[in-house]
From Swiss-Prot:
It catalyses: thiamine + ATP = thiamine phosphate + ADP + H(+). This is Thiamine kinase. Keywords: ATP-binding, Kinase, Nucleotide-binding, Transferase. It comes from Salmonella schwarzengrund (strain CVM19633). GO terms for molecular function: ATP binding; thiamine kinase activity. One of its GO terms (biological process) is thiamine metabolic process. It is an enzyme of class 2 (transferase). Belongs to the thiamine kinase family. The keyword Transferase applies. Pfam families: APH. The keyword ATP-binding applies. The gene is thiK. It comes from the Bacteria.
């Protein structure tokens, strides 16, 4: 269901107009941030998500809704409702662990996603990295950051090994173990891109875990494991810069200390690797 109202409504207006029998249940839970909440009525539970990024155009939030509308129930929560500034999606009942599933399970989940029809919009990292630079705290801009950004822009993004729909924020807190199996939540960064970019961006603990995931995926997708790992490594500098820039971006938006700590740690990793 999609509303044509062009003026963003408050949460209370959304509830009274479209979900009059529902009440807020939990302030924050699975993949929620920026004023989103869980609402319920009897045994029915819905996630009400708010467009919380003031620097992102409304079209990005609409893409999030469209991605959920396209995906099968075996991968993601169902999209239920959209109006400018808000969407409602199915609440997934299940277990969320901070740790990733084992390599074979995660490879199967990602391969299932990558077999779906493309969303229709490409993920472009170069303009995103430039946006993070321009929107960050000017006091945080360093010559090192600018050099790395210009070097990546000069080299250009790696040529895709295989294009597919991507989630692009795969970590333990965004994976729900439901009665029907593993599913992914928080699809706001989804788009079409290289499967190796997705694998490069998974929030792994170390290189050993990363190699295990890459090998498991290669076996399932019938791709040469060495070729896939080389492609993942080509994307690695882009992904590290993406994470550092995102932490800086969120620090500027929220002022939350966790983001500045994560940004500092990511910059240290980049400097250690030259």
């Amino acid at each position: 269901m999609r509303s044509n109202n062009n003026n963003p409504l408050t949460r209370d207006e959304i509830l009274s107009r479209y979900f009059p029998q529902y009440r807020p249940a939990v302030a924050a839970s699975q993949g929620l941030s920026g004023g989103s909440c869980i609402i319920d009525h009897d045994t029915h539970r819905v996630v009400l998500r708010r467009h919380h990024d003031p620097d992102a155009p409304p079209a990005h939030f609409l893409r999030h809704y469209r991605a959920l509308s396209q995906l099968p129930a075996s991968l993601a929560p169902r999209a239920l409702f959209y109006t400018p500034g808000w969407m409602a999606v199915e609440y997934l009942h299940g277990v969320v662990n901070s740790a990733l599933p084992d390599a074979d399970e995660l490879a199967a989940l990602l391969y299932h996603l990558h077999q779906q029809p493309r969303f229709g919009w490409r993920i472009a990292l170069s303009p995103l990295l430039a946006q993070y630079w321009s929107c960050c705290d000017p006091a945080r801009r360093t010559p090192f950051w600018l050099r790395r950004l210009k070097q990546l822009q000069k080299n250009g993004e790696p040529r895709p090994l295989r294009l597919a729909p991507l989630h692009m924020d795969v970590h333990g807190d965004n994976i729900v173990l439901t009665s029907a199996g593993l599913k992914l939540i928080d699809w706001e960064y989804a788009g079409d891109g290289d499967i190796a970019l997705e694998l490069a961006a998974v929030w792994v603990e170390d290189e050993r875990q990363h190699r295990q995931l890459a090998d498991a995926y290669a076996a399932r997708a019938r791709i040469d494991a060495r070729q896939l790992w080389r492609q993942i490594r080509l994307w690695h500098p882009w992904v590290i810069m993406l994470k550092a820039g995102w932490f800086e971006y969120r620090w500027r938006q929220t002022g939350e200390q966790q983001f500045i700590r994560l940004a500092d740690e990511t910059w240290r990793q980049l400097r250690m690797k030259g």
